């Protein structure tokens, strides 16, 4: 069978209509190739994806790159397949775009192993439902917001509170401690941030264990609506074929929904609540259901969630919440205290913070830590107005321990050594639980609270206190 060639009949921004011969219509979601001289000199440089069959042998497609320079009558090749993504070792350490082409200037990527980006979620019979904690080495997360392997965590926070640094630290720890692979999907993010992340990962030495797939703000909506699927396809290969525990970061999941809404409007669908696409729940569901543990390996997702106008009832974040196993909330108030990572220990939550999953000791320590911090928060107004002297003896002890806990929740990161000047620390889960248990039990009431700031394990805090005593 020869190549199936069609021709462009209409171009409306990112929407391109293509006419084929009778009986040769490509299927929905098929990738078609066009040579667009505006992009570069290469042949077949523009990929468009079939979205609708209009009748009269015409298909309506959504472009994955700019359509400036296209004219009616141009030839269009039918690939016969969905968008195909290169997978495996070839993509590690590389930056790809939505259609799997490199954008880092380091030459071509091997096309030996390719997978379609549209795939079904694993069957129920293949899924692994046992809950195992993913140790991240970050104290505040492991203690209070434990990540389930194969789970989905949302990271909420404004600009400049440290979402990217926590992400990079987790990429580093998964690579160094577990030998795991990380995939980063930049969905509708700032090009500058994507560039910064690439260089920081390169300098931090974590790039060889990571694959980056970018569809930035400047890309047409078609690319932004597909880039998360392209990255997920890469992660699925490592899970299913190589039996790896993979970490996928999606920054920002809201932009995926936003791009879907733009595509929906371009295709002439009637909008739903707040102008979103009527298929919002199913679009997000198709992506999220592919992120899971199977009997071969797991994909754990960390998704940054932008909340439009801080309205958590907006359909986009509200639909996302339904899929999440937990939320890591980063707080500007904690940044102001100089405590990093700036995770809010009272606002953050995890589905597996439960004695059935973690054991009684871990659960008990985590809840006691939260109770002490909550009590300290309630007493802060009294302290501000009347001072510490007016508190009861019991409250004074609680406040002193809470302040130590607050500082002990900070931690020097490997990827932030340049800013902090302190070597990074990876803290094992049992050491984290033991350290906080000793503080809440009052074993370290005699140590100054400064000794607990920016340390790894509790032993380091004790050494700090000794050094301070000697210096005094």
Swiss-Prot record:
ATP binds at residues 157-164. Its EC number is 7.1.2.2. Transmembrane segments: none annotated. InterPro entries: AAA+_ATPase (IPR003593), ATP-synt_VA_C (IPR055190), ATP_synth_F1_bsu (IPR005722), ATPase_a/bsu_AS (IPR020003), ATPase_alpha/beta_chains (IPR050053), ATPase_F1/V1/A1_a/bsu_N (IPR004100), ATPase_F1/V1/A1_a/bsu_N_sf (IPR036121), ATPase_F1/V1/A1_a/bsu_nucl-bd (IPR000194). GO terms for cellular component: plasma membrane; proton-transporting ATP synthase complex. Belongs to the ATPase alpha/beta chains family. Produces ATP from ADP in the presence of a proton gradient across the membrane. The catalytic sites are hosted primarily by the beta subunits. This is ATP synthase subunit beta. It comes from Desulfatibacillum aliphaticivorans.
């Amino acid at each position: 069978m020869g190549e199936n060639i069609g021709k462009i009949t209409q171009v409306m921004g990112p929407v391109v209509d293509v006419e084929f011969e009778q009986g040769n219509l490509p299927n929905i979601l098929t990738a078609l190739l066009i040579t667009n001289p505006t992009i570069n000199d290469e042949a077949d440089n523009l990929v468009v994806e079939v979205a609708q069959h209009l009748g009269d042998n015409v298909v309506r497609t959504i472009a994955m790159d700019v359509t400036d320079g296209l004219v009616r009558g141009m030839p269009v090749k039918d690939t016969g397949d969905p968008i195909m993504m290169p997978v495996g070792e070839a993509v590690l350490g590389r930056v790809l775009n939505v259609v799997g082409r490199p954008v880092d200037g380091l030459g071509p990527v091997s096309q030996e192993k390719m997978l379609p980006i549209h795939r079904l979620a694993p069957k129920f019979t293949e899924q692994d439902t046992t809950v195992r904690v993913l140790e991240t080495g970050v104290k505040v997360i492991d203690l209070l917001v434990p990540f389930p392997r194969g789970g989905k965590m949302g990271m909420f926070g404004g600009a400049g509170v440290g979402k990217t640094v926590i992400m990079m630290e987790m990429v580093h720890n998964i690579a160094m401690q577990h030998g795991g692979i990380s995939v980063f999907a930049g969905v509708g993010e700032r090009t500058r941030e994507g560039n910064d992340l690439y260089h920081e990962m390169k300098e931090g030495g974590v790039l060889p264990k990571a694959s980056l797939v970018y569809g930035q703000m400047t890309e047409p909506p078609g690319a932004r609506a597909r880039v998360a699927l392209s990255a997920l396809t890469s992660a699925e290969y490592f899970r299913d074929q190589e039996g790896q525990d993979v970490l996928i970061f999606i920054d920002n999941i809201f932009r995926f929904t936003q791009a879907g809404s733009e595509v929906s409007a371009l295709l002439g669908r009637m909008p739903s609540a707040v102008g979103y696409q009527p298929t919002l729940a199913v679009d997000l569901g198709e992506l999220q259901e592919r992120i899971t543990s199977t009997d071969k390996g797991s994909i754990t997702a960390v998704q940054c969630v932008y909340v439009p106008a801080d309205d958590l009832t907006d359909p986009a974040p509200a639909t996302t919440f339904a899929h999440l196993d937990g939320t890591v909330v980063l707080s500007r108030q904690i940044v102001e205290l100089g405590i990093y990572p700036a995770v809010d220990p009272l606002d953050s939550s995890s589905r597996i913070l439960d004695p059935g999953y973690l054991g009684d000791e871990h659960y008990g320590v985590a809840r006691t830590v939260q109770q002490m911090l909550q009590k300290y928060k309630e007493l802060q107004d009294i302290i501000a107005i009347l001072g510490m002297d007016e508190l009861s003896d019991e409250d004074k002890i609680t406040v002193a321990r809470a302040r130590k806990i607050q500082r002990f929740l900070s931690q020097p990161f490997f990827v932030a050594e340049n800013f902090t000047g302190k070597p990074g620390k990876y803290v094992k889960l049992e050491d984290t639980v033991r350290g906080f248990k000793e503080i809440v039990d009052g074993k370290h009431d005699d140590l100054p609270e400064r000794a607990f700031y920016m340390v790894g394990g509790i032993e380091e805090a004790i050494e700090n206190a000794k050094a301070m005593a000697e210096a005094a």
